Amino acid sequence: MARPPAAAPVLRAEPEPPRVEPAPQPAQPTAQPSEAPTTTSVSLQNPPGSTKAEKIAWLARQAERCEECRGLGTLRDTMVFSVGNPEATLMFVGEAPGFEEERQREPFVGPAGQLLTKIIQTMGLRRPEDIYISNIVKFRPLEGDARHQGTRNRKPSPIEMAAAVKYVLAEISVIQPKAIVALGATAAEGLLNLSGSVSAMRGRFHDLNGIPVMVTYHPSYLLRAEGDGPVRAKAEKRKVWEDMLKVMERLGLPISERQQKFFA
């Protein structure tokens, strides 16, 4: 097994320094014809930077001031971008930040995130060193009066997803992971334009521009299943684990006999 990529710092949005306009230059006495220089257009699909980390940091700054997202009036103010190693071969994508994610400005740090971390560790990987985690929407969806929303969360609407999905697609273009795990139906819809139940989409790989995508249940679904008793909770966890075994196999990760039998 290849040595996991080196750890990268948690990526957070940084405000851009104020733009300084250059001083006007005196006109030249004569204009000599010359060939126009060739320049590369800077865009979300072609972010500036010499490393993946620099490109991701630039994307985070663009997401911070996303006028299309903020202009909806249905999202809260705090931008939560991503966490993990830009050199990772495995990427997880969820739907949107919740209360804890907004408070800590990091995706998947609440109860569902803690369960995701356990899944990652059970795969024999480390968070954040070996993986990269992001969301379809970078702002927590607003529910009622923002001042009294408290811990209440909701899934993003199709309009909110359409405004924000360009950022996670740009991240994928930079990271170029060898596999993506779409956590829940919202992530599947945003990445793959698929609708329907996760049960109908999971268990097999889908294609996103040549990158295999495994759709599986969101960790919050597994937490809700625990309320239905241990038998159902174990059965649903086994389904997710079977999906992760397929991902591990695709990535060439070692799978022990003990790992094969988890939740069986």
Which residue stretches match the model-derived regions?
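A polyanion-binding, active-site-adjacent surface
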Residues: 1-264
